[in-house]
Amino acid sequence: MTILGLWLVSSDNKVMYTLPIIILMFSDAFAALIGEFYSKYKFNTGFGTKSIEGSAAFFLTTYFICINFFLFFSDIGNINIVLVSLLLSILTMILEVISWNGLDNLFVPFFVYMFLRLNLYLTEKELMYKFWVMVILFVIIILNRKKTTLTRTAQTASLFFLYIIMIMGGIKWLVPPLIMYLGYYHITPKVEGQVKDSLKGLLAIAFTTSIWLALSIVMDKDKLFLIYIFSFSLHFGIINLIRDNAGNINRETFRMKFLMGSIGKALMFFIINHIILSGITDFKMLEGVIVLIFGGIFTYETVMKIYYIVEKEKELSGETKVFITSGIVFFYSLLLLGIGML
């Protein structure tokens, strides 16, 4: 399936077709071999177990393959070869780590193909810019590693997510997820004995927000950017509610003070991002944002209250709550899209 798909999209470009397959054949195989027989430092991704040694083997093999492949089969400059190989090796290593159930066999080669299409013939200056974006995001995540509830694997995935957002949409689209990543720990209530949030939860949030960036390629960019900000704002408000409810003993009762606090933080998140980043003055959509933030947060709280009335002794995991949140956010984002299309 992967080989057929690459053959269909590569349009007889030998580099675009061959390199993804070679990386899949050798990097993935060496990583699996090293991880199986020589690994000492293993970590749980939320979908299974990977090893630091296996990831390092994947990175080094990919880098070696890319350097030599470009030297022999491309006409790009030496500095460009190093930069493209380095960026591609880092990103595919992260993608391999966060893939599950063998889907790296699909994700990695198609990502390599897309990366080559977008980056192979960029100038040295453009590649250096992308490299420094990667370095800066990496430094931010390292400095913030103790001020987050994410597992280390999820933090690594957030680097991949933020980088892709930056490259596809630019700084404008990067700011909302970066503010959320850096701010939620400090602005939302602290939780005693906080269980680390998994990769699965991060992927759910990433999907329900980044889909609007993907759609902006073919639809109204300004309106979709407003929906993009809205989706992060609603996520932020519900996360505030989740963290506040973690210490709530009376789970079956509504607490209007805290509900309004979460709504206020969601609206503040939206207003700050909208004023700084979005110039849209579609008052119909802006009114819809206010109404739908109220509706989304009350919907989440109502779902939780009904659950706790029915299941008095059971507690939902944080991961499950994030899945529910992502579903609610996506639903209300679709409603806002409908308002924008009227």
Residue ranges and their predicted role:
Residues M1-F30, G35-N44, S51, S55-L342:
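Hydrophobic alpha-helical transmembrane segments
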